[in-house]
């Protein structure tokens, strides 16, 4: 008697179909989640771009860094206040403008917001240390970070910083970028902008800063809270002398 062919048994085909359905479900879920993240990312970039475009006409009230610092200070010392007062570009001494460029970004007037060599050097230093310790930041990159981003050090934040830098350089002219920078950068504990710094350290308006005063303020920028607390630092005086000698060669951005 000839045996009948053995069937795969009940449930075999449905099991394969169930596996395919499960994979399709996972793929759809991943596509949905990816779409949500992509949409949120694009919305964030649009928000940044709109804000920057508005600042071609309106002055920023405060920066993300300033607001975060105000929150930290209010928790640590409730009596501490943020010192900040916006002044137009032409009311900031040319000596301070030249000193900041000489100290922070000598090619600011001509670069595109990035210094590739500095970024590569920072990358090598970070790779050697196994963590982010340097960013190779131009004035525009510093402004991008101060206006919108947290103090966190990560490659994701650095990537966002580069995107915002491109937006700033595309939507604003160099003089406007520098004006916003000088009015929002930190000069000490709770001290933001050229006017507040001039009044806090020298009891004068930003328009009357001397070359030596400007050089000292510019040297404070990489570590303002430290130098606020150590104003007699020999390094501060020595470095200010170096910057004072370089100021004459510093090129200011052209007026538009």
From Swiss-Prot:
It is found in: Cell inner membrane. Keywords: Cell inner membrane, Cell membrane, Cell shape, Cell wall biogenesis/degradation, Glycosyltransferase, Membrane, Peptidoglycan synthesis, Transferase, Transmembrane, Transmembrane helix. It catalyses: [GlcNAc-(1->4)-Mur2Ac(oyl-L-Ala-gamma-D-Glu-L-Lys-D-Ala-D-Ala)](n)-di-trans,octa-cis-undecaprenyl diphosphate + beta-D-GlcNAc-(1->4)-Mur2Ac(oyl-L-Ala-gamma-D-Glu-L-Lys-D-Ala-D-Ala)-di-trans,octa-cis-undecaprenyl diphosphate = [GlcNAc-(1->4)-Mur2Ac(oyl-L-Ala-gamma-D-Glu-L-Lys-D-Ala-D-Ala)](n+1)-di-trans,octa-cis-undecaprenyl diphosphate + di-trans,octa-cis-undecaprenyl diphosphate + H(+). Peptidoglycan polymerase that catalyzes glycan chain elongation from lipid-linked precursors. This is Biosynthetic peptidoglycan transglycosylase. It is an enzyme of class 2 (transferase). Pathway: Cell wall biogenesis; peptidoglycan biosynthesis. GO terms for molecular function: pentosyltransferase activity; peptidoglycan glycosyltransferase activity. It is a single-pass membrane protein. The keyword Flavoprotein does not apply. Belongs to the glycosyltransferase 51 family. It comes from Burkholderia pseudomallei (strain K96243).
